[in-house]
Every structure is written in C-alpha cells, then in structure tokens.
Regions:
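Auxiliary alpha/beta "docking" domains used to position bulky ligands
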Residues: 1-138
Length: 138
C-alpha cells in the first residue's frame, strides 16, 4: 500500500496501538513545525538549565528542525518508556539498610538505549510495512 491511498487517522491509531503493544507508556505523533518549541529550548539553554549536559546545545537547530536532520521528514513519533524495573526495591528501604548498596535506578535493568532502540525499530518496521513507500528513521 502506498501513502496516497492510506487512511491516516487509522494509521495513527494503529501506530499508537503498536506502541502500547511494544510497552511504550505514551506515544505522540506531531508535525515538524517546532518553531515555538525552538524558542523555548533556546531560552532554556541560554539560562544554563542543561547543566553538564553539553550535548543538549550541540547540533544547532537539528533538534527542532527535523527536516534538516532527515530531509523529507513529514511526521515525528515521540514515545515514553519507563525503565524502572517493576521488582526494584524501594529506594528508602535500600538507603536505610547498612548492608545494602544503592544503585541508581537507570542502572538496574538492561541498558535503556538498547531496549529503546529495539522497540523503536520494531515500531518502525510496522510503520514501513503499512505505508510501503516511506522510510522510518530510528
């Protein structure tokens, strides 16, 4: 199927369903006009709120102009994935235990980036199979 004869409302609903099936807690689909957000990001960076996260200021407008990063971009799919393992011990319980070490929550499970990339690639594959004539970038 090509994108010219797709029901885009149904495609959006399917993408959100696939996202839930893959374990994403939230999934949003937006266009590529982030001009308003670009202004807020620049104010945030100018205020130094990024702290030591120097990467936040790198790459100029590539964060807010998706078409500059990947020419031809028409939509952006954003997802949220909790990475706190369900079986993680309560933080305060661990801190109160002199015989236990406290490990940052992000380090308790499998590498978040690997988990996220695999799930995003599965989502991209579903999208590409449905639309046929477009490419997804993870």
């Amino acid at each position: 199927m090509t994108s010219t004869n797709l029901d885009f409302s149904q495609l959006a609903a399917d993408i959100k369903l696939w996202g839930r099936e893959l374990g994403f807690q939230e999934l949003g689909i937006s266009d590529t006009d982030l001009s308003r957000e670009e202004m807020f990001l620049q104010q945030w960076l100018d205020s130094g709120y990024q702290g030591d996260m120097d990467y936040m200021a790198r790459h100029g407008t590539a964060r807010t102009r998706p078409d500059e990063l990947v020419p031809g971009t028409v939509r952006v799919i954003s997802v949220r994935l909790n990475y706190l393992p369900v079986a993680a011990r309560d933080s305060w319980e661990t801190l109160d235990d002199p015989d236990a070490a406290f490990i940052s929550r992000y380090a308790l499970g499998r590498d978040y980036h690997k988990v996220m990339r695999a799930k995003l690639q599965a989502l991209a594959t579903n999208v590409e199979q449905r639309i046929g004539d477009r490419k997804s970038v993870v």
